[in-house]
Amino acid sequence: MSNLSVNAIRFLGVDAINQSNSGHPGVVMGAAPMGYTLFTRQMHVNPEVPNWINRDRFVLSAGHGSMLLYALLHLSGFKDLSIEELKQFRQWGSKTPGHPEFGHTVGVDATSGPLGQGIAMAVGMAQAERFLASRYNKEGFPIFDHYTYVIAGDGCFMEGVSAEASSYAGLQKLDKLIVLYDSNDINLDGETKDSFTEDVRARYEAYGWNTEFVQDGTDIEAINAAIESAKASGKPSLIEVKTIIGHGAPNKQGTNGVHGAPLGPDETAAARENLGWNHAPFEIPKEVYADFKENTVDRGRQAYDTWVALVDEYKQSYPELGSELARILEGKDAVEFQSSDFPAVENGYSQATRNSSQDALNVIADKVPTFLGGSADLAHSNMTYIKSEGLQDDEHRLNRNIQFGVREFAMGAILNGMSLHGGLRVYGGTFFVFSDYVKAAVRLSALQGLPVTYVFTHDSIAVGEDGPTHEPIEHLAGLRAIPNLNVYRPADARETQAAWYQAVTSKSTPTALVLTCLLYTSDAADE
């Protein structure tokens, strides 16, 4: 049965890519057994309640393989992904764009495509789960108890952002993060031996990860056993799965020719014969749907129903936390923040806006227990520290100060993952000139409609003693050019409060706060 279902995934991908005359069939054909194992053996999802906050998360970091995800969602009963939608793959207005888009297609947990960011966002999801579990879980009430899974390819591990984020995840011991490495030795330009020869598992062991190895990427039982071993490790896990790109396409498998182009009619016919798939394009045997109904849909629905009953009992046993949880489940902040919560700013009050920002964010932190964030090793310069808290780590999971280290890009992507998870308000800080390092993540914040707040300080030539490398010049224009990003450059303490209020009440727009170290005075004209 499993072989039939895996081939169904493969040929949904092949046929949709052929029809659109565009796409990446190789990863779909090679990674289909991994996707099948995750959805039918491991993950708890409910297509009837796709935004269930305690669902297992799945991030296809190798977003060019989007038809793998769309095929899995279709077979798992997600209504957005009908056969007709699969036939519209990569077409204008469809639910099946070339790369997965969060908020556009139900069942997609993250917008991916820029390689490596999917891994980093998954790190954020795992950290969000850990924080929320630490705050809300009680004995007998595992309200937040799920895993975050990733399928990533060689290209993802070449990108620096995955290295930054993975180093951080190992430090944090995020043991509910499991990354499956689609290790096929091929990239778009040829073989990875020409550009990428390091021992990835050894690198991840140095990060503090558990690693597993599956020699045969078609062996579902071995893949499943590796996942079970990963779950017992107490660490984030990397599972290297050796696959053949384009598995089953006899003349193209194992080559870069199957990476980024349709198989075409002749090779598709040969693959059908080679894999014993005797079905017309987009024709799926009823046994495949039955397999997914029993092992994905019904299993997920049962898990969801059990969880709903648990939440109802929890609200009775812990009414105060239950009230916060109820708001989170409605898509709201645990506690509502109002502009009147800020203290009044007196006329004539002089303060640098970075200091005004610290005052404001501490007022917010005192009111909203699910507001947290940090800085890329500049907390005391960016003034991003929550004064009532210590640093968050594996032994202090409830603390709300996050020390991201000098990892600006990963910080932004991790914040995106935390926001994608739901239930949290998050922020991160660095020098304004280093917004260049984080801008790719800021762009994904905007594309995904995530209300992440970026605190950029030292916006002034007054940092001139550091030299031109640290003087932001073109950066404001660059941020303002990003659609769906609110950029605030407040002039004094009052405007800084107003900017923070807009940031923490935003529903679907990220915010960039551009702040200085110079004194600014509030006067009556500001009122």
Which ranges hold each PLM region?
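Flexible glycine/proline-rich, aromatic-decorated loop/lid segments
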Residues: 196-202, 258, 390-392, 441-458, ...
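A short, small-residue-rich loop immediately preceding and capping a beta-strand
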Residues: 20, 56-57, 109-111, 141-159, ...
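Non-catalytic terminal/interface segments that mediate subunit docking, oligomerization
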Residues: 312-436, 442-450
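A glycine-rich helix N-cap at a beta->alpha junction
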Residues: 81-88, 173-179, 446-459
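Glycine-rich ThDP/TPP pyrophosphate-binding loop and its adjacent helix/strand module
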Residues: 47-48, 104, 110-292, 481-522
